[in-house]
Curated annotation (Swiss-Prot):
One of its GO terms (cellular component) is cytosolic small ribosomal subunit. It holds the Pfam family Ribosomal_S2. The keyword Lipoprotein does not apply. GO terms for biological process: translation. This is Small ribosomal subunit protein uS2. The keyword Ribonucleoprotein applies. It comes from the Bacteria. NCBIfam families: rpsB_bact. Keywords: Ribonucleoprotein, Ribosomal protein. The gene is rpsB. It comes from Chlamydia abortus (strain DSM 27085 / S26/3) (Chlamydophila abortus). CDD domains: RPS2. PROSITE patterns: RIBOSOMAL_S2_1 (PS00962), RIBOSOMAL_S2_2 (PS00963). Transmembrane segments: none annotated.
Length: 276
């Protein structure tokens, strides 16, 4: 019999993290009724025994994706989730989207890869060819670099479609969920009482607005990924790399309308070069 991933969480741990607090009763989705314990003071209380059961049922599927040598994509762009998502993905050597989800990140990867090529070219110019650039050009390039990196750093080295997408709050990340479902990619999600669980393959009912709740559950998933990789002898490689590129905000260059126009022209130049 195959060894099951460890899940050392208890109902008490989940309760202390506030994972049981759902939304106000007037904001619920009836399809979440299965996971609700009771109504109290105008709030729905999530059945944490079911949360624990669902998590323990989902973890073997997470580990199965790792064993099949498929990447995992963490998605959480709302304020409470983004730092947790990014940290967990980096520690586990997986991929993430913690800022804005760009339409087509999964379903139109050709366009996304062109943007990544643009990012690569800008980094090369800033790190290797900067002696040929004016201070103004460097500042404009650095600004363009920051914009691209902010949205793309977590998927920059994602070479194939993920085997699993892990989402915090599918109602907030509905475009990501829709793209995953269109491609037949399973979705594991932290789902609150206001969400529709129907499109989710692995539902983890919990408070998806609490930082403590999100961190506790995502950390448990992350630990299972790391443990599985160690048992398989798989190297954990960070999905991001750090370059010594000066922040454009630190440069003594004032943004004018002409600067913005030049930035737009610069962006078009790089984009057209990659298209060719």
């Amino acid at each position: 019999m195959e060894e099951q991933p460890l899940c050392n969480l208890s109902v008490k741990d989940l309760m202390e993290a506030g994972a049981h607090f759902g939304h106000q009763t007037r904001r619920w989705n009836p399809k979440m009724k299965l996971y609700i314990f009771e109504e109290k003071n105008g709030l729905y209380i999530i059945n944490l025994a079911k949360t624990l059961y669902q998590l323990r049922k989902a973890l073997p599927q997470v580990c199965k994706v790792i064993k099949e040598n498929k990447p995992i994509l963490f998605v959480g762009t709302k304020k409470q989730a983004k730092c947790v998502i990014k940290e967990a993905a980096i520690e586990a050597g997986e991929y993430f989207v913690a800022e804005r989800w760009l339409g087509g990140m999964l379903t139109n990867m050709t366009t996304i890869r062109n943007s990544i090529k643009t990012l690569d070219k800008i980094e090369k110019d800033l790190t290797q060819n900067s002696s040929y650039l004016t201070k103004k050009e460097i500042a404009l390039l650095a600004k363009r670099h920051q914009k691209l990196l902010k949205n793309l750093e977590g998927i920059r080295y994602l070479k194939k479609a993920p085997g699993l997408v892990i989402v915090v709050d599918p109602s907030y990340e509905k475009i990501a969920v829709a793209e995953a479902k269109k491609l037949g990619i399973p979705v594991l999600a932290l789902v609150d009482t206001n969400c529709d669980p129907t499109p989710i393959d692995y539902v983890i009912p919990c408070n998806d607005d609490s930082l403590k709740s999100i961190r506790l559950i995502i950390s448990t998933i992350k630990d299972s990924i790391i443990d599985t990789k160690k048992k398989l002898g798989v190297e954990i490689v960070s999905p991001i790399k750090t370059l010594d590129i000066q922040d454009s905000e630190d440069m003594d260059v004032y943004a004018t309308d002409e600067d913005n126009r030049q930035e737009d022209l610069l962006a078009k130049k790089y984009d057209s070069n990659e298209a060719n």
